[in-house]
């Protein structure tokens, strides 16, 4: 599942619009809509979005052969 789908799912659960989220992170609704369409976010943007949505965000890699998460 891409980040855009995850963000849109949380927006639905929080009863928020893209415009509302955009205002919270200091961008325009059009800019955020474009990023969601491309599923193209920097790590910093994801942290800001998570904070605005009242969520924790962590990025990690899990090795398939050992299950070790880095």
Predicted segment positions?
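Short, charged recognition helix plus adjacent turn
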Residues: 23, 60-70
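Polybasic/polar functional segments that serve as interface/processing modules
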Residues: 2-4, 24, 49
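Short alpha-helical DNA-recognition segment
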Residues: 15-30
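A short, Lys/Arg-rich alpha-helix, primarily the initiator
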Residues: 1-16
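The alpha-helix within a helix-turn-helix
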Residues: 11, 22, 50
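DNA major-groove recognition helix of helix-turn-helix/homeodomain DNA-binding modules
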Residues: 45-58
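Recognition helix of helix-turn-helix/homeodomain-like DNA-binding domains
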Residues: 26-41
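Helix-turn-helix DNA-binding elements, focusing on the entry/boundary residues of the two helices
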Residues: 18, 43-46
């Amino acid at each position: 599942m891409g980040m855009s789908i995850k963000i849109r799912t949380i927006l639905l659960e929080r009863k928020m619009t893209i415009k509302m989220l955009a205002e919270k992170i200091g961008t325009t609704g059009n800019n955020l809509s474009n990023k969601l369409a491309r599923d193209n976010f920097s790590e910093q943007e994801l942290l800001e979005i998570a904070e605005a949505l009242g969520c924790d965000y962590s990025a990690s890699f899990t090795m398939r052969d050992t299950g070790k998460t880095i």
